[in-house]
Amino acid sequence: MRILHVVPTYLPARRYGGPIVAVHGLCKALAARGHEVDVFTTNVDGDRTLDVPESKPVDVDGVRVTYFPSPFRRLYWSPAMRKALAVRIRTYDVVHIHAVYLWTGIAAARAARNARVRYVISPRGMLVHELIRRKSRMVKTLWLRLLERRGFDAAAAIHFTTVLEGQEAARIGLPLPSPFVVPNGIDLVPRPNIARDENTLVFLGRVTWKKGLDRVLEALPSLANVRFVIAGNDEESLTPKLRELAQKLGVADRVEFLGPVYGAAKYELLARATLFVLMSTSENFGNAVLEALMMETPVVLSQEVGLAAEVARAGAGVIGLEEVPALLHDRGRRTRMGRHGRALVESRFSWPRIAEEMERAYAAL
């Protein structure tokens, strides 16, 4: 199959977190299965521009990636991408569009309709009622009604990463033709042979309001001698407010902010953690959850995390901070959870398996 993925940003723009890594993992795994995979994206990297060739293909792990310049960065508008879509989109069997509220998705859907090419849309967690309500509600509502609706209506299918994400999207009122669920995957690596810390909670991810870091801080006063390590890019400048809250709660000496952590250092951090915590108010999937499970670290999740129910069923973690004290005092239970978590990742979330599932979904369009 010839497959085109259209995404507003791409590696090496790691500041955008899990969705970027997930899209690249999927593209790489599809290419490894023999498919011809192209990515159209922009060179936007926050307020900077990626140091990559413009408007010509670059090989990234076997995936042909074309980075187009974007004069209007906020919406990722790119005349060069529009021209390329008009010329080349009819050469693909399937177009896979990632993200909403951005020009790239609207342009790709329009070009695919004009060329009568089947396309799939992955909202990537952006169609969540609570997120729309809390941030730019009027703008997002009008955008969906006036600009996105036609694209969704004509899509061959809508892809979600979890059942929960699909349920949330259904509340928005957009047409969701032929919805299907294929989760994100992960590249399997062994757990490093290092000792695990005692009484240490770890969060890994983008530091944003929806991640529920305040929930964990507010629980710390009742968790004597427990440290909380926060690792991730602070794209909303929340760290000063979180430090202030920790000071107010009297736990500032037990909270550590590491900033972004990548590669081997990331896995060492997760492998040392006693527990991984993610108390998001909204989380369509949670790639860091898979990374923690792969390091045999039990996870503590809010019920709003898309993976929470599956993790709990597998015995690899718990839902709710109220479970933390009992877990901290039961090393045997944590060890069993760690083994269950690793087994879950290996059996369900390896990229070869996920690519095979997505391939079947494409073939069924």
Please name every model-derived segment:
Residues 298-301:
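Short hydrophobic beta-strand element within catalytic cores of glycosyltransferases
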Residues 333-348, 354-360:
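A short, well-ordered alpha-helix in the C-terminal region of glycosyltransferases
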Residues 1-53, 57-61, 90:
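N-terminal subdomain of nucleotide-sugar transferases
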Residues 281:
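Aromatic "clamp/platform" in nucleotide-sugar-dependent glycosyltransferases that forms part
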